[in-house]
């Protein structure tokens, strides 16, 4: 049942704002004293070096960019496409990541292998990092563990917006990964030599390791332009 609340008019003490002013000064003073006399950095290596240099300096200033604080384990960095052992992308162009993306920043064009018509691969795989809201839905939706955000890198600075649009050449990086349930390991592939296929099967594992590397400096494209180009081709085909 709804009830009505009567709003009383503020008294003189509240209209003068003295309690709020004192409360704000107290909060500023508390943080000032804490930062002046107590440490803010929990890294023991940095703390030990600072104490060795200054003796009393527990309040640590991180000398960026020479010193960088490590990202937490769950940090969502830049995207990367996970490669297979043979260098191809694990992506099968199922469009699940593009469908799950709420920002619609992923554009994919699918193609088929000439020697394996059952499986598809991304002819174009483009991510607009400026539109990305870093929700991680694409990673969760991928059934092949083909896209990850474990690079540990944030978006690099750039003077042009087009430099933040990453294509498949720039995204395909990191250590190769194979799983025991990969279909190309079970049925084989004519384009992969038998020795290489056996090596891939031997290295296949239920879980993969995470590693990072530097991203390739490959120029990207515009996601909207690619989508419009595909739409125009479809209309011309009609």
From Swiss-Prot:
Transmembrane intervals: none
Known catalytic reactions: a quinone + NADH + 5 H(+)(in) = a quinol + NAD(+) + 4 H(+)(out)
Record domain 4Fe-4S ferredoxin-type: where: 81-111, 123-152
Residues binding [4Fe-4S] cluster 1: 91, 94, 97, 142
Membrane disposition: Peripheral membrane protein
Cofactor note: Binds 2 [4Fe-4S] clusters per subunit.
One Pfam family, short name: Fer4
Record-stated family: Belongs to the complex I 23 kDa subunit family.
Complexes and interactors: NDH-1 is composed of 14 different subunits. Subunits NuoA, H, J, K, L, M, N constitute the membrane sector of the complex.
Protein name per UniProt: NADH-quinone oxidoreductase subunit I
Organism: Anaeromyxobacter sp. (strain Fw109-5)
